[in-house]
Amino acid sequence: REVFGNIDFRRAMSIAINRSEMNEIGFFGQGTPRAYTGFSPLPAFADASMETYATEYDPAGANALLDGLGMADTDGDGIRELPNGDKLVLNLNFSTQGIAGQTVELAAQYWRDVGIASVVKEVTPDEYRSAQSSNKLDVSMWRKGQPLAIVLGNNELLVPPYENYFGNRNAMLWAEWIASNGS
């Protein structure tokens, strides 16, 4: 899990995704490829560059970032190893209540194209929420979009864990840390 704390790893994984293609296949071209900001439309107090941060499709750039982290395919199987030699395999559990399966499959393929292995598994919504609540997900797989009026009337979207039980809560440990006053 340490690798997820590295901004270059997260950026590499982001720019390895072809959001335009994913929009066409998974959302019938109806979406707007962007980074999640929590707001739509973006309010004046939010920096517009947040919507496009690390959203360009750049597999060569992703490969360069991963190379720079010392993640290399040392055994020739097409999958990168971590600097300590361990394989990195991302478990992509998802529920179709939160995201379409083909979207998850596309993400897995884009990441495979830059040497990151993953296992895609559909689970029930209850299994997903249980794993999410207990911080057992490698990657949060959930589509997200909220109109500004809902965001402004719902502080759950602005405070860790950034949602309620029925949404995509992606900061459970941070919320626990805040609730415990840092202990």
What are these model-predicted stretches?
Residues R1-F28, T32-P33, T37, L42-S183:
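Extracytoplasmic/periplasmic ligand-capture domains
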